[in-house]
């Protein structure tokens, strides 16, 4: 039995991270962001997620103003707790986030994923700490055969520890990275 829970957003979420409230002032928010070394924090009403406060949006208001003044204009970006971590990675990348709220089905914020936690899980997922040789192939998608690659590796008394692939849009080639 493999424990793959590290791949699920709920399992990656930090539970004790500060959550902002509508009555919090800009100066308080900026101090929290500095203390926790992030550029974003979730804004909640009761326990429900209303939006993601960015440092940039807070700098646009006076230090004594509350978050209620900007609540309507916030990004409403979060990841479902049951989602695979690659969904979190997609959101981090697309929106250039430093932190991502993890939400349950009722839109309650159950924790956050930081860039550090995400990076640790990516490293674990790709086996970055495992020893092995890395081979990068560029082939036509029609030539791709996982069974053939596996056969070639295994007949040479080795095994595939990790395999990643993607399409290169400019050339149409399939790029395959093997760790052996």
Question: What residues fall within each predicted segment?
Answer:
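Bateman/CBS regulatory modules and CBS-like beta-alpha motifs in cytosolic regions of diverse proteins
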Residues: 3-32, 43-44, 49-52, 63-91, ...
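Signal for well-folded cores of large energy- and translation-related assemblies
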Residues: 34, 93, 123, 153-157
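Short hydrophobic beta-strand motif reused across regulatory alpha/beta modules
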Residues: 39, 51-58, 98, 110-118
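Short low-complexity, flexible loop/linker segments enriched in glycine and/or proline
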Residues: 57-58, 71, 175-179
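Short, composition-biased local secondary-structure segments
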Residues: 60-61, 113-125, 157-160
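A conserved regulatory-domain signal marking ACT and ACT-like small-molecule sensing domains
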Residues: 130-180
């Amino acid at each position: 039995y493999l424990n793959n829970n590290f791949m699920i957003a709920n399992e990656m979420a930090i539970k004790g991270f500060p959550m902002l409230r509508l009555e919090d002032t800009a100066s308080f928010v900026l101090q929290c962001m500095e203390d926790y070394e992030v550029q974003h924090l979730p804004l909640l009403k009761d326990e429900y997620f209303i939006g993601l406060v960015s440092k940039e949006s807070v700098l646009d208001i006076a230090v004594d103003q509350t978050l209620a003044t900007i609540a309507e204009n916030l990004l409403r970006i979060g990841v479902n707790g049951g989602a695979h971590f690659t969904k979190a990675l997609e959101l981090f990348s697309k929106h250039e986030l430093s932190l991502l709220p993890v939400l349950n089905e009722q839109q309650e914020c159950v924790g956050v994923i930081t860039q550090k936690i995400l990076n640790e899980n990516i490293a674990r997922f790709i086996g970055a700490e495992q020893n092995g040789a890395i081979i990068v192939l560029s082939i036509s998608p029609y030539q791709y055969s996982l069974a053939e690659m596996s056969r070639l590796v295994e007949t040479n008394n080795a095994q595939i520890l990790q395999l990643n692939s993607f399409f290169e849009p400019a050339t149409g080639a399939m790029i395959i990275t093997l760790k052996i």
